């Protein structure tokens, strides 16, 4: 939480009056890490809502670093396709199993999507032959007590048969919900029923909506990271200007103190001989060409402290400030140095607070397409004048050299002949147009008959 407020006293963000105009509050927080993505948020307003899931700190920081590196090293913008391999899915504090990445990718590309999360369960067989289902991680925002009540209701209504007992054995070490089954019950079938009828499997609806210049906007993942980086550029720029101003003010005073040390006896004489501090300040300004700030700093010091100043200590501080001022001016003058500061600070945050991912990413049957089940191979499609279609592999054909006899590719019905012949692959789609104006789409995976059929 302190990293959200880091440097808030250095004019890094704007302040506005609070509700009763008695105090001032920040419009936004400096936030050294993308809090909106890392911790997530949920909110409902008039006509709109936002529901952003939490993410892994290391992954989000790595994504921002990727954007910075592309700008600094290659002078180009980052694409969403470069971010998706880094931030693959949300990371819920309660763990759970995220089913596939299709919903995550849709949410990250469009700003809206549905992510299916399943409880982490395992089936144990007891010595008496009975089985029990043990849930050790629940989907995000699922109330454990309500879940147990729901399962009990389903058992009572006989919508799920085979459960004999439900126990909550959770403790400080973690969640543990035990579901005991009858000896003749099929544990996998009951587990699938629980996934279907209870929140052991739940859906997280993503709406990545936030205010940009006081206007609500649904953003994809890259947009959110880019806007955060712009915010950090503004924060670090304002902080650097603040630090530069303070360093120059302090160095200006040090220069006055060093000049006073060169004439310390005369300075003390002027101060002691003056009727008040104002007269002493004016005399010092006139005699040593000091500024109002420098003279005031000398007058404000007690004589004992003034005579006890160590020149070497002041000179070392002066040299340090000169180097610091040069560094701060360089950061303000060079965008790449500014981005380097942001990268260094964010990397330190990830190193200090980052942890391993809690939510695992599993496979979802919806992520498996027909292309994944069909081997890719070159193929030839032949269609006859009577509408017969045949698929043949390219291996069935070979070039006919001069002379010799060819190979018969297919058998046709009397008075039928090949009208169209095309070469494609089994991962391409074939459109079938009917005389009724309809079109049907199918993968080119027509069953492959023998060569002479």
Short names for language-model regions:
Residues 30-34, 377-380:
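Short glycine-rich loop/turn motifs
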Residues 30, 38-39, 208:
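Intrinsically disordered, low-complexity linker/assembly segments
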Residues 3, 8-11, 42, 48-447, ...:
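C-terminal interaction appendages of subunits in large macromolecular complexes
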Residues 35-37, 169:
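Short glycine/proline-enriched loop/turn "hinge" motifs that connect secondary-structure elements
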Residues 4-32:
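P-loop NTPase nucleotide-binding/switch module
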């Amino acid at each position: 939480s302190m990293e959200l407020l880091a440097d808030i006293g250095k004019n890094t963000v704007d302040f506005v009056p609070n509700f009763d105009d008695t105090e001032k509050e920040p419009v936004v927080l400096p936030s050294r890490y993308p809090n909106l993505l890392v911790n997530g948020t949920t909110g409902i307003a008039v006509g709109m809502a936002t529901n952003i899931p939490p993410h892994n700190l290391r992954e989000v920081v790595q994504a921002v670093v990727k954007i910075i590196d592309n700008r600094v090293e290659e002078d180009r913008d980052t694409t969403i396709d470069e971010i998706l391999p880094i931030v693959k899915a949300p990371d819920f504090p309660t763990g759970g199993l995220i089913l596939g990445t299709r919903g995550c990718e849709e949410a990250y590309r469009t700003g809206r999507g549905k992510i299916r999360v399943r409880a982490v369960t395992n089936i144990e067989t007891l010595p008496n032959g009975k089985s029990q289902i043990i849930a050790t991680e629940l989907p995000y925002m699922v109330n454990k007590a309500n879940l147990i009540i729901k399962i009990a209701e389903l058992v009572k209504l006989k919508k799920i048969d085979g459960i004999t007992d439900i126990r909550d054995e959770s403790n400080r070490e973690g969640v543990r919900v035990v579901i005991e089954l009858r000896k003749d019950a099929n544990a996998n079938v009951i587990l699938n029923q629980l996934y279907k009828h209870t929140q052991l499997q739940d859906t997280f609806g993503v709406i990545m909506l936030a205010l940009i210049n006081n206007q609500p906007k649904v953003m994809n993942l890259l947009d959110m990271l880019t806007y955060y980086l712009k915010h950090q550029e503004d924060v670090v720029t304002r902080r650097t200007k603040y630090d530069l101003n303070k360093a120059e003010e302090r160095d200006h005073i040090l220069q006055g103190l060093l000049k006073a040390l060169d004439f310390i006896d005369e300075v003390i004489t002027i101060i002691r001989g003056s009727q008040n501090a104002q007269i002493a300040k004016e005399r010092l300004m006139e005699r040593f060409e000091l500024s109002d700030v420098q003279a005031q700093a000398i007058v404000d010091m007690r004589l004992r402290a003034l005579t006890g100043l160590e020149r070497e200590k002041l000179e070392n501080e002066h040299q340090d400030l000169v180097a610091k001022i040069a560094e701060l001016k360089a950061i303000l003058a060079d965008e790449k140095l500014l981005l380097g500061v942001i990268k260094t600070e964010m990397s330190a945050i990830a190193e200090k607070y980052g942890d391993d991912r809690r939510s695992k990413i599993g496979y979802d049957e919806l992520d498996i397409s027909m292309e994944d089940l069909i081997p890719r191979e070159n193929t030839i499609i032949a269609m006859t004048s009577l509408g017969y279609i045949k698929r043949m592999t390219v291996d069935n054909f070979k070039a006919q050299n001069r002379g010799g006899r060819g190979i018969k590719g297919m058998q046709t019905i009397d008075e039928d002949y090949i009208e169209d012949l095309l070469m494609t692959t089994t991962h391409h789609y074939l459109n079938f147009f009917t005389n009724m104006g309809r079109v049907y789409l199918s993968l080119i995976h027509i069953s492959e008959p023998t060569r002479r059929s």
